[in-house]
Amino acid sequence: MDKRWNLIWFKIQKLNNYWKKKEKLILFVLAAAQFTHIVDFMIMMPLGNYLMPYFKISTQQFSFLVSAYTFSAAASGFTAAFFVDGFDRKKVLLFGYTGFIIGTLACGLAPSFYLLLVARVLAGLFGGLIGAQVLSIISDIFPYEQRGKAMGSVMSAFAIASTFGVPFALYLANLISWHAP
């Protein structure tokens, strides 16, 4: 009887260690998604000195580029709140992140102001979906007692994006071109 309990205890510990490793991987992936989403949102403001002369646009037109992402992200996040609960969260996150990558790549490849504006709207539509899904996944996966720690870990991506992501993106813009970040 004692051997059986020891075996059961060993298997429980092994499963617990496996789950902790998986938790860390999940948190890293979710934080990376938040990081890229926030860098993409924030990078436009400091790129104004590159974009306005490149596209020969006014400061008002540049403000459209900055706000296009914000408004489309807000609209998609609000609208998605009514629909996405019926779908698998992982699939919605993957769908949103795929669209976000396409929109972000389109931003870097945009040859004109209007195409960049459309690409910013597209990236924002999917970016808004990402932010909501990340928090929903944390709420689903982590027990109540661990949720605050998990959300804090993922939300630290905001601080990292602003302190390291944006300066690195500006470094790439200086080194290569505004298309790089």
Task: Put a short name on every predicted segment.
Residues 25-59:
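Extracytoplasmic
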Residues 50, 78-82, 171:
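Membrane-interface helix termini in secondary transporters
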Residues 75-114:
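Conserved MFS/SLC helix-loop-helix module at the cytosolic interface between two early adjacent transmembrane helices
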Residues 119-157:
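Cytoplasmic helix-loop-helix junction between adjacent transmembrane helices
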Residues 153-181:
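Helix-loop-helix hairpin linking two adjacent transmembrane segments in secondary transporters
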Residues 58-66:
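Juxtamembrane helix-start elements in MFS-like secondary transporters
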Residues 38, 42, 124-132, 163:
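Small-residue-rich segments within alpha-helical transmembrane domains of MFS-like 12-TM solute carriers
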Residues 42, 70-78, 162-163:
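Residue-level signature of mid-helix packing/kink "hotspots" within the transmembrane helices
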